[in-house]
């Protein structure tokens, strides 16, 4: 019954037939589940009827003698090569839902990464797109890769996320984009939660949203990595049904799947099964059991065929992989498929995505300019920061509360000559607090955003420079407001000179130090392979910066062989600038009630702190150089990370 239903889908009845066929075969379903499947049927049928999607060429992918090897051992001592994929050949056609299966470690994800263009170095063989050698940048624009983990920005609503995707990927009028987004959300059953933030979506909704985001520009090729991972059976059925519908709409849909249920297994059009990096079966689903039977492997009557082939590949019935490898290499799969279903798998003459005779050469340029991408990404990043309770609200409140606490602790000491060292302690702590308040939130959040950036950039949403400029500029207003709020509290409460120019310089130095610290946080976040690494490296890098700041040890007392380290401490220039701002600029004598006050004259304070010869403009200049250098270095690290992904 299920087989007939699948054939009906091929004839154009829509994947809803699958839902009804399986339901009738399994017996009477509870009314709630029946209603749910009815809704799924309606949504999936709609997924084939997109009217506003841009027209694209249908794509067939062929790979010949594909192999992949990696170097073993650490970078300083390579021990040779390890081959992960060996001599894979085959063809994935339009209008087909292809499942790549195999036990853990078989090479499924590696194989799909190579097909998608995410891995290049170490690959041998040939990949053809519509019979021509693949041009990677062009292919990346006509394909999309939906990863196993649905990395979404948590503070955007479903509709906002979709509009960002549409604005980046399409050059149409805004009304057309809105109609397209509405059509996709309706078809995928997400319209009811269009104003819900992505962090509050269920697993199935997140997966469908990840598909919807990539569907905006109607990619002819779609790659899915373990799309059913972590989902319940109903959500798994929805996702696979949706993929099948997208495939039968004229796309080539390829997914890795570990061990599907029998119901999901029958929904695939073709299988490509791997074991130990080699192919042990390729062909239509219905041909798997007869093919294995011809090789002397009999699947038990009530056993899930997907479970059986995984057990065979894992060696539970003996080491049969060499025999299966040879059978595929000798063309037994192809012969068995032609024998069992002659002419059944021929492609339809017309593809609704785009007439095959057009087959245009697509450009690899982006749909929008770099400036447009920057504006869209700036707005998205700014909105995300504004809505982030931890990153923004807590950060703002911490500056207010710490400012009040410090103001009370150092109340009215700024003009007291007997408390000069207390005041310098206040100035140093201000630099310390502003540094960590800017450094750590960036260190903690940027690695989490890296996964979203990598997915969107590799799926050709935008350029690296547009993203980085938007990320750099969007947080600047917050890095200005928070230090100014802190300075406005502590400067006056601690009784510093009541001069507007000194207050403005004090605030400017605080802002400059915070921006440099944030730049260092971006660099650490971009270079770190995980959040744990970033969390450790962030505070550790602060230790030498503080140690050579000039507060704990003056420059003259630092050993000669370590004095160069003092020039690399950006806190030194911020702290030095604050000392010059408070006690320099020809400030008059300080108030002192004691009989002896050696620090009544501010020049003595400057001499004691070894900043008498320092220039305030040089401190600003060096902080500016630090800011630009760290931002540029973070950009280069991001660029390297993107290239290393391939």
UniProtKB/Swiss-Prot annotation:
Q: Which domain of life is it from?
A: Eukaryota
Q: Which reaction does it catalyse?
A: cholesterol(in) + ATP + H2O = cholesterol(out) + ADP + phosphate + H(+); desmosterol(in) + ATP + H2O = desmosterol(out) + ADP + phosphate + H(+)
Q: In which tissues is it expressed?
A: Highly expressed in the brain, in particular in neurons, microglia and astrocytes. Expressed on blood brain barrier endothelial cells. Expressed in the spleen.
Q: Which residues form the ABC transporter domain?
A: 61-301
Q: How does it sit in the membrane?
A: Multi-pass membrane protein
Is Cell membrane found in the keyword set?
yes
The main place the protein resides is membrane
A Pfam family of this chain: ABC2_membrane_7
- Cytoplasmic side of membrane: 1-393, 447-472, 525-532, 639-646
**GO annotation terms (biological process):** cellular response to high density lipoprotein particle stimulus; cellular response to leukemia inhibitory factor; cholesterol efflux; cholesterol homeostasis; positive regulation of cholesterol biosynthetic process; positive regulation of cholesterol efflux; regulation of DNA-templated transcription; sterol transport
Disruption outcome: Abcg4 deficiency does not significantly affect the levels of sterols in the brain except for brain lathosterol levels, which are slightly elevated. Abcg1/Abcg4 double knockout mice display significant accumulation of 24(S)-hydroxycholesterol (24S-HC) and 27-hydroxy-cholesterol (27-HC) in addition to the cholesterol synthesis intermediates, desmosterol, lanosterol and lathosterol.
List the GO molecular function terms.
Answer: ABC-type sterol transporter activity; ATP binding; ATP hydrolysis activity; protein heterodimerization activity; protein homodimerization activity
**Described function:** ATP-dependent transporter of the ATP-binding cassette (ABC) family that may be involved in the cellular efflux of sterols, in particular cholesterol and desmosterol (a cholesterol precursor), to high-density lipoprotein (HDL). May play an important role in the removal of amyloid-beta peptides from brain, in a process that can be antagonized by desmosterol. However it is unclear whether ABCG4 can directly transport amyloid-beta peptides or whether peptide export may be facilitated due to changes in the membrane lipid environment. Induces apoptosis in various cells.
Report the protein name in the record. ATP-binding cassette subfamily G member 4
Q: Which organism is it from?
A: Mus musculus
Q: Which gene encodes it?
A: Abcg4
């Amino acid at each position: 019954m299920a087989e007939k239903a699948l054939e009906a889908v091929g004839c154009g009845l829509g994947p809803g037939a699958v839902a009804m066929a399986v339901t009738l075969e399994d017996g009477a379903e509870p009314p709630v589940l029946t209603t749910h499947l009815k809704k799924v049927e309606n949504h999936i049928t709609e997924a084939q009827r997109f009217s506003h999607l841009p027209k694209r060429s249908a794509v067939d992918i062929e790979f010949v003698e594909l192999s992949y090897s990696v170097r073993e051992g650490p970078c300083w001592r390579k021990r040779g090569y390890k081959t992960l994929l060996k001599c894979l050949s085959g063809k994935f056609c339009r209008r087909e839902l292809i499942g790549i299966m195999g036990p853990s470690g078989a090479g499924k994800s590696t194989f799909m990464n190579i097909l998608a263009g995410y891995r290049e170095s170490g690959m041998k063989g040939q990949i053809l797109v519509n019979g021509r050698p693949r041009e990677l940048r062009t292919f990346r624009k006509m394909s999309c890769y939906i990863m196993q983990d649905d990395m979404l920005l948590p503070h955007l609503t479903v509709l906002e996320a979709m509009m960002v995707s549409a604005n980046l990927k399409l050059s149409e009028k805004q009304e057309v984009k809105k109609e397209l987004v509405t059509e996709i959300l309706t078809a995928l059953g997400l319209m009811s939660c269009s104003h819900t933030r992505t962090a509050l979506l269920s697993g199935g909704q997140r997966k469908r949203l990840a598909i919807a985001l990539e569907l905006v520009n109607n990619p002819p090729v779609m790659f899915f990595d373990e799309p059913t991972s972590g989902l319940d059976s109903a959500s798994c059925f929805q996702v696979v049904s949706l993929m099948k519908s997208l495939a039968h709409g004229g796309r080539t849909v390829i997914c890795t799947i570990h061990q599907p249920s029998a119901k999901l297994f029958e929904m695939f059009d073709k299988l490509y099964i791997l074991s130990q990096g080699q192919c042990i079966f390729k062909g239509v689903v219905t041909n798997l059991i007869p093919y294995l039977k011809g090789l002397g492997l009999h699947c038990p009557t009530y056993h899930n065929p997907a479970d059986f082939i995984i057990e065979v590949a894992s060696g539970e019935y003996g080491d049969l992989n060499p025999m299966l490898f040879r059978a595929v290499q000798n063309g037994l799969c192809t012969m068995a498929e032609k024998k069992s279903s002659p002419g059944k798998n021929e492609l339809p003459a017309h593809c609704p995505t785009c007439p095959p005779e057009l087959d245009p050469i697509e450009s690899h340029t982006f749909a929008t300019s770099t400036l447009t991408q920057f504006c869209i990404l700036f707005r998205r990043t700014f909105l995300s920061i504004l809505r982030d309770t931890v990153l923004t609200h807590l950060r703002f409140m911490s500056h207010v509360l710490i400012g009040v606490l410090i103001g009370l602790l150092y109340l009215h000491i700024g003009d007291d000559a007997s408390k000069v060292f207390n005041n310098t302690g206040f100035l140093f702590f201000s630099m310390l607090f502003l540094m960590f308040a800017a450094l750590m939130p960036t260190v903690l959040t940027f690695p989490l955003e890296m996964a979203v950036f990598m997915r969107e950039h590799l799926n050709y949403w935008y350029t690296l420079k547009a993203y980085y400029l938007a990320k750099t500029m969007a947080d600047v207003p917050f890095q200005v407001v928070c230090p100014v709020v802190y300075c406005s509290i502590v400067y006056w409460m601690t009784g510093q000179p009541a001069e507007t120019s000194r207050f403005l310089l004090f605030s400017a130095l605080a802002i400059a130090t915070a921006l440099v610290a944030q730049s260092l946080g971006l660099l650490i976040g971009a270079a770190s392979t995980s959040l744990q690494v970033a969390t450790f490296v962030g505070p550790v890098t602060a230790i030498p910066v503080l140690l050579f700041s000039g507060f704990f040890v003056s420059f003259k007392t630092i050993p000669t062989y370590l004095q160069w380290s003092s020039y690399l401490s950006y806190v030194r220039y911020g702290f030095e600038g604050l000392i010059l701002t408070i006690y320099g600029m020809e400030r008059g004598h300080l108030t002192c009630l004691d009989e002896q006050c050696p620090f009544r004259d501010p020049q003595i304070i400057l001499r004691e702190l070894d900043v008498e010869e320092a220039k305030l403009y040089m401190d600003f200049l060096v902080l500016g150089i630090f800011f630009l250098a760290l931002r540029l270095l973070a950009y280069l690290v991001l660029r390297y990370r993107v290239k290393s992904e391939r």
